Curated annotation (Swiss-Prot):
It comes from Shewanella loihica (strain ATCC BAA-1088 / PV-4). Mg(2+) binds at S18. It comes from the Bacteria. GO terms for cellular component: cytosol. This is Shikimate kinase.
């Protein structure tokens, strides 16, 4: 790879953005960042706490700033939060500053991958599937709108998906 380009991973909760992102960064010798982890690092608290204390609006404000800061770096792989796509500012930054890869997955796979994860505030409800379906209606068209590449993550290991991304990007 002659120049260091940014790769931004978008997609719903449970698509594998963080896991695939780590593999991708390692394989391409790029720096890996996770926007949720960066928010936790900056606040000194976990995402659930930020949601409890500041609400979703406060969390989204922090997320917008973190993504703006991280996308100014060069030579990174960034795993974004599933809901970050709803911010026009974030969509603009992702589109303008790197290659956007949409990691697509089914609702069934999302449910299976997130059912035991207590760190997902939006899913701490009686029927997480219903929440995921509603979020998909809103967010999937936005992921598709800004994606340079779309890769399905169902039934594949993170390493296989990372290799598919590399192949599709021609790296």
């Amino acid at each position: 790879m002659a120049e260091k380009r940014n790769i931004f991973l978008v997609g719903p909760m449970g698509a594998g953005k963080s896991t695939i992102g780590r593999h991708l960064a390692q394989m391409l010798h790029l720096e890996f960042h996770d926007s949720d982890q960066e928010i936790e690092n900056r606040t000194g608290a976990d995402i659930a706490w930020v949601f409890d204390v500041e609400g979703e609006e406060g969390f989204r404000r922090r997320e917008t700033q973190v993504v703006a800061d991280l996308t100014e770096k060069q030579g990174i792989v960034l795993a974004t939060g599933g809901g970050s796509i709803q911010s026009k500012d974030i969509r603009n930054n992702l589109s303008a500053r790197g290659i956007v890869v949409y990691l697509e997955t089914t609702i069934d796979k999302q449910v299976a991958r997130t059912q035991r994860d207590k760190r997902r505030p939006l899913l701490q409800v009686e029927d997480p599937r219903e929440v995921l379906e509603k979020l998909a209606e809103i967010r999937n068209p936005l992921y598709e709108e800004i994606a340079d590449v779309i890769v399905k993550t169902d039934e594949q290991s993170a390493k296989v998906v990372a290799n598919q991304i590399i192949d599709q990007l021609g790296f």
